[in-house]
């Protein structure tokens, strides 16, 4: 539903509203020889990318699997590689800033379970805690979330789902790029 790309040495974000626009951009000749990194891409992103490649291109990618998970995907004709950074950075993305001394960066909170098509353009109160995966968080993380959420609600913060999603994605990509 939304994607962000950044070049390794350039923090400028390239924004895409769907997989088609992202892949059309990525498959341009200027990206030959590039590597595309996604943290935990094996679990979601690479499945969508591979589906696009098979449905909309003539390429037959080389794929390395671990079970049903895509560890690496290569379009040989373009020398374009899709690599899951979890293969060599076996930690949660939220730990990257501290691990790599990027003190100005922090992975924020996002209501992943609220991120469905009918809510893409929602504006209103900060969504309920349940949409943030509250029940699957560590006690420490849950405490941080509650503190953040209560502060947002107390100030009548207007949640703009699309703007928040964009900001969250840019932050994630920036954390990965700079790490």
Describe every region a protein language model picked out:
Residues 1-179:
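Metal-dependent nucleotidyl/phosphoryl-transfer cores and adjacent nucleic-acid-binding surfaces
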